[in-house]
Design a protein with these regions (language model features):
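Conserved catalytic SET/PR domain of SAM-dependent protein methyltransferases, capturing the structural core
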Residues: 2-202
Length: 202
């Protein structure tokens, strides 16, 4: 059976070995812990997810990025696309995690974990009641278009900044986290970024 790696493998295929940090956490979940928590997505997992979201979303190959998530229908600005659920929670960062609080890092379920980064995102996030994020369209999205979000909209500080390879004309080059890019995130995505980061704006 063919196994498809998780979000960390997607990053590594692009040479993006990102690690995330909060303002306090300094250690990361081990790769072994992450692997046992997340596992690897078998083709059957992908097929089941695509069946569940048929006519709405599709996990497919994203050129140069491994797997990605694509729209199977049009979405209008502010329209809810999907809700991601936290399947693992920690107070330290991990290679598969996204940050939802100052000392809270979660691993999302499929298909949210496979949404790639872009500096010109078409998707924004809001906190939800299942421990992760709801994903909303922040511009008109056409059928067949890849859904992408800006990782700086959730990560306070990327402890190992990395060179972005999104290919967007608006690519900012080096990704370092909201701490170093707050003006752009607020201007581009308000109100669709992590709630805990908005507390820092006050």
């Amino acid at each position: 059976m063919v196994l498809v790696s998780t979000r960390a493998l997607l990053l590594s295929r692009r040479g993006l070995h990102a690690r995330w940090s909060s303002n306090a956490a300094s250690s990361s979940l081990s790769d072994e812990t992450q692997a046992s928590t997340v596992g690897e997505f078998a083709s059957a997992d992908i097929e089941e997810c695509n069946s569940r979201y048929r006519g709405i979303l599709q996990i497919s190959d994203a050129e140069g990025k491994g797997r990605g998530l694509f729209a199977s229908k049009q979405f209008a600005p502010d329209e809810l696309i999907m809700s991601a659920k936290a399947v693992a929670v920690s107070d330290v960062r991990g290679s598969h995690s996204v940050q939802t609080g100052w000392d809270k890092h979660v691993v999302m379920d499929l298909p949210g974990i496979l949404i790639n980064h872009s500096c010109d995102a078409n998707v924004g996030i809001r906190d939800n009641d299942v421990g992760a994020y709801d994903f909303f369209a922040i511009k008109n999205i056409k059928k067949g278009e890849e859904l992408v979000w800006d990782y700086n909209a959730s990560e306070w500080e990327i402890s190992t900044p990395f060179q972005c390879a999104c290919g967007s004309a608006r690519c900012r080059g080096l990704l370092r986290g909201f701490k170093h890019d707050s003006m752009h995130v607020r201007r581009s995505y308000e109100p669709f970024y992590a709630s805990y980061l908005k507390q820092n704006d006050q």
